[in-house]
Amino acid sequence: MKHIRNFSIIAHIDHGKSTLSDRLIQVCGGLSDREMAAQVLDSMDLERERGITIKAQSVTLNYTANDGETYQLNFIDTPGHVDFSYEVSRSLAACEGALLVVDAGQGVEAQTLANCYTALEMDLEVVPILNKIDLPAADPDRVAEEIEDIVGIEAMEATRCSAKTGLGVDAVLETIVKCIPAPEGNPEGPTQALIIDSWFDNYLGVVSLVRVKHGSLKKNDKIKVMSTGQAWNVDRIGIFTPKQVDTDGLNTGEVGWVVCGIKDILGAPVGDTLTHAKGGCEERLPGFQKVKPQVYAGLFPISSDDYENFRDALGKLSLNDASLFYEPESSSALGFGFRCGFLGMLHMEIIQERLEREYDLDLITTAPTVVYEVVLNNGDLLYVDSPAKLPAVNDLDEIREPIARCNILVPAEYLGNVISLCIEKRGTQVDMIYHGNQVALTYDIPMSEVVLDFFDRLKSTSRGYASLDYNFQRYELSNMVRVDVLINAERVDALAIITHHDNAQGRGRLLVEKMKEFIPRQMFDIAIQAAIGGHIIARSTVKQLRKNVIAKCYGGDISRKKKLLKKQKDGKKRMKQIGNVELPQEAFLAILHVGKD
C-alpha cells in the first residue's frame, strides 16, 4: 500500500492538464508510441473537437522511481470548465493529493483558485506545478509569487516543466512520489469502495469506476450496493492503463472499474458505497453533495415518434452525468418532451450535442431559465423552473431570483470594461483586491444574467484575459415579470420568458422583431405581440401575401374593383379564422439569442 499514489490534476481551462497527463502515460509506458494520440484521455469526439475535458478519466501507471522502488500511480484527469466543477469534486474524493497545474505565462486564474480551494477543503496535499516553461512569454518566478500571493501555498520550490516538449516531466513524477501521501485504509477490514463514476455499456451493462477505501474486491465476489441493498456478482474487474485491462481484483487504495451485470440504470448511483454482501461494512462512505441544476430548458423531439428513444437516451446519459436532471413536460406548441436541468449553458450545449450525436435524435430547445422562488398571496412557497409554471400575476406576492457570487480575476488594464459589464448585468460589488497586476473582483450578479451570455461577454470585453468562477449564493426579492408571446392572439407557451421589469420592454421588442424574421409569410396577416399579463408591450406584423385581383380590370367602373377587393378581403378574413401558423425551429432558437448581440 505504501507504494500507491492517488492524485488528480486540477487547473484552469487550457493550462495543459490533458497534455501533461499524455506525457505521464508516455513516460510510464502505459501505451506504445503507436497508440499514443494527443489528449488520450479525452475519449469523446466532442471533447477533442472543442479541446476541453468534460468527463473525468482515470489511469493506472507503474513508475520506477530514482530510489529503485516501483510505485503504482492512479491518476484522474479532471475538467477545468466552471460548468463541470462537480466532476472535479468527485475526482478529488478518490485522491490523497492533487497537482495544481499553472500556466507559467498566464498565471493564476479563477478556476485554478476555485478547484484549489475545493482540494484544500477536502484535506488533500496540493502540489503546484508550473507548466509551459518553453513559451517565450513564460515567467515562472512571477507566477510562483502569484501562486503564493493569491492561493497561499508554498510555490518557490514548485516543479517546472513543459508538457508539450516533455521537459521536466520526470521531475514531476518524482515530486508525486515524494510529496503525495500514500493511501490510508484497513486492508483486513470489511470492504468499502466508493463509486466515483459510472457509464452504460451496451454489452456489459453498468460499468462503475471505484476507489477501494478499505478491504478488497475480487472477481466473483458477492457485493451489494449500499443505497439499494441489492446484491450482485462481480463479473469482471480491472484497471485502465488508458485501455480497459482485466485483473483478478482491487486492493485497498486502488482505483479501477467493476462490472456486475447491472442492467438497471439506477442500480449503481455515483457517490454510493459498495461492500461485501456477507460480513460487509455497516456505514456508507460520505458521498458528494448533490449538485443542483442552475439552468432549466425544455427539450422536445422534433418528431413525436422519437419520444421513447429520447427517454431512453436521457436515462443512459444521466447515469454518466450525475448532474443532469429531467422530468416529463408537455407543451401545446411542441408536444411531449422533457424539462431538463443543467449546470450552465456549456453543459446544456454539450448534453444537447451528445444526444443528437450519440443517440441520433433531432431536438428543439426552449429558452433556458433559472429557478425562481415565488411567494403566493396565501403564503405558499413555490420553486418555478419554467415560465409556463409561473402563477398568474394576481396570485403572486413576490418573486425572488437567484443571485450568483462571481469571482473574477482580471488584469488591471481591463478592470473598467469588466466593472461596467457587471453593472450592466445588475451586479453589486462585494470586494476588490489588487494582487500585483491582477485584480480579484467579487460581484453578486443575478443568476439569469450570468447564465445567458455573461461568460462570452466577459471574455470579449477583456480580450480573453478575465476568468470567472461562480456559485449560487441566495435568493433575493426582485421585480421579475413573465413576457408572453402571442401569435394571432394565441399564447405560445414555449416562447414565454421571465425577465426583469426594467428590461421587459426591450427584450419584448427584440423578441417580436426576431420572430418576425423567422415566421414565413402566409395568406393572411400574422400579428406577433409581446405581453405582460393583459398589457401588450410590443407588436409587429408579418404581412400577408396577396394576389393583385384588380390587375385584369383596365379602366372601367370603380365599383367593379371595389367588389373584387371586398371579395378578396372576406376570403382572407375567413382564412384567418381557420388558418393556423406553423412555427419553424428557428423561431424557438431566436429567443436564445435575444439580448446577445
Curated annotation (Swiss-Prot):
It catalyses: GTP + H2O = GDP + phosphate + H(+). Its main location: membrane. Keywords: Cell inner membrane, Cell membrane, GTP-binding, Hydrolase, Membrane, Nucleotide-binding, Protein biosynthesis. Belongs to the TRAFAC class translation factor GTPase superfamily. Classic translation factor GTPase family. LepA subfamily. Transmembrane segments: none annotated. One of its GO terms (biological process) is positive regulation of translation. HAMAP family: LepA. Its EC number is 3.6.5.n1. It is found in: Cell inner membrane. It holds the Pfam family GTP_EFTU_D2. This is Elongation factor 4. GTP binds at residues 14-19, 131-134. PANTHER family: TRANSLATION FACTOR GUF1 HOMOLOG, CHLOROPLASTIC, TRANSLATION FACTOR GUF1-RELATED. GO terms for cellular component: plasma membrane. It is a peripheral membrane protein. Residues 2-184 form the tr-type G domain. One of its GO terms (molecular function) is GTP binding. Coiled coil: none annotated. Required for accurate and efficient protein synthesis under certain stress conditions. May act as a fidelity factor of the translation reaction, by catalyzing a one-codon backward translocation of tRNAs on improperly translocated ribosomes. Back-translocation proceeds from a post-translocation (POST) complex to a pre-translocation (PRE) complex, thus giving elongation factor G a second chance to translocate the tRNAs correctly. Binds to ribosomes in a GTP-dependent manner.
